[in-house]
A protein has these predicted regions:
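Membrane-embedded alpha-helical segments of integral membrane proteins
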Residues: 1-41
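Intrinsically disordered, low-complexity boundary segments flanking structured domains
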Residues: 8-9, 77-81, 129, 237
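Secondary-structure boundary/capping signal
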Residues: 16, 46-47, 71, 139-140, ...
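Hydrophobic alpha-helical segments, especially transmembrane helices
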Residues: 27-29, 66, 207
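Glycine/proline-rich, flexible active-site/cofactor-binding loop segments
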Residues: 33-68, 173-193
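N-terminal signal-anchor transmembrane helix
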Residues: 42, 49-112
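Soluble catalytic domains of enzymes that build or remodel membrane lipids, polysaccharides, and related
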Residues: 91-92, 97-112, 117-309
Length: 309
């Protein structure tokens, strides 16, 4: 019954945290359903076999939902590894975990990767102070430190026509909007970190923030890259609407889940640190980097503005 409930609950599209939270462990639910189905068929009686059939249905449904994020599916965003080096833009997105005290690991990572665009989440004044040397290298820095796990640091060496934090929902979680001039053309950057579906946090504000960001992307004349800890898995209903409203493409489709959270657990990991691109942007690479003491892995992307954009 638990497998059936956790499979059916997200179909209601309810905003309650105990509904939306079941979007996350679809792979885990499918595995439990398969095991339950096998056990049900081994016990020869009508009731257990009915349960086994229900488990197979649940497993198949969950598999259909997550299949696009397997290497067997067709990709929706081709890689362009031959993009000229001088036209590439590197982006680094990291939820640092506000309580994480391993500042030196992040400093070394930033020094090594030297991204053109740096987007850090869960940053407070302590983190801002710890990264002063690294941030001083960037032409544009937007600091919005907070002590509620939703502080943001945005930094870029690209010419910025606009770079600011805005509030797209009423839950005091800022979003970064930036219009940047890349080597081969301009593009728009959206950095998101909405609240997760946990006890005390239903998802109305998260879903509204994600939807409004997508609509902003749809209205700009520039190609758009959206990046950050969405606190939402790639296969959720909200993520699908985000892609539809903004015309986004997901590099995970057809390549694998590339789970980014929880970095401290080998079993319960989910792809919630996202990268989305609209037409007009080419993807050179998208990678998960090493553990830096946070509960999220750093995510790095290299993009280029498509020729003619």
């Amino acid at each position: 019954l638990a497998v059936v409930f956790t499979t059916l609950a997200p179909l209601t599209n309810g905003a309650q945290w105990w509904v939306r939270g079941w979007d996350f462990p679809r792979l885990h639910i499918a595995c439990v359903a398969v095991i339950a189905a096998i056990l049900g068929f081994m016990l020869i009686n009508t009731w257990t076999q009915i349960v086994a059939v229900l488990m197979i249905c649940c497993a198949l449904y969950q598999a259909v939902r997550i299949f696009p994020y397997s290497p067997m599916a067709k990709t929706e965003l081709a890689l362009t590894p031959d993009a000229p080096a001088e036209e590439r833009v590197s982006l680094l997105s990291i939820n640092v975990l506000m309580e994480n005290t391993e500042h030196e690991k992040l400093r070394q990572l930033i020094d090594r990767e030297d991204p053109d665009v740096l987007f850090l989440m869960e940053t407070d004044a302590v983190w801002a102070s710890a990264l002063e040397e690294q941030l001083a290298r960037y032409e544009t820095v937007v600091l919005h430190p907070l002590v509620n796990h939703y502080g943001i640091i945005f930094a870029t060496r690209l010419p910025a026509r606009q770079a600011e934090t805005v509030f797209l929902s009423d839950d005091e979680t800022p979003t970064v909007l930036a219009e940047l001039e890349g080597p081969s053309g301009a593009f728009f950057f959206v950095g998101l970190h909405p609240r997760p579906p946990v006890p005390g946090n239903d998802t109305e504000a998260r879903d509204a923030q994600i939807k409004r960001a997508a609509l902003l992307a749809d209205r700009t004349y520039l190609p758009v890259v959206a990046m950050g800890d969405f606190n939402d898995v790639a296969w959720s209903w909200t993520a699908e609407r985000f892609k539809e409203y903004g015309g986004f493409r997901d590099p995970r489709v057809g390549r694998g889940m590339l789970p980014s959270f929880d970095a401290n657990s080998w079993l319960m990991r989910f792809p919630i640190d996202q990268l989305y691109l609209t037409e007009g942007l080419d993807l050179v690479s998208f990678d998960r980097l090493e553990h830096i003491g946070s509960d999220h892995f750093p995510m790095k992307a290299v993009i280029a503005v498509s020729p003619g954009e």
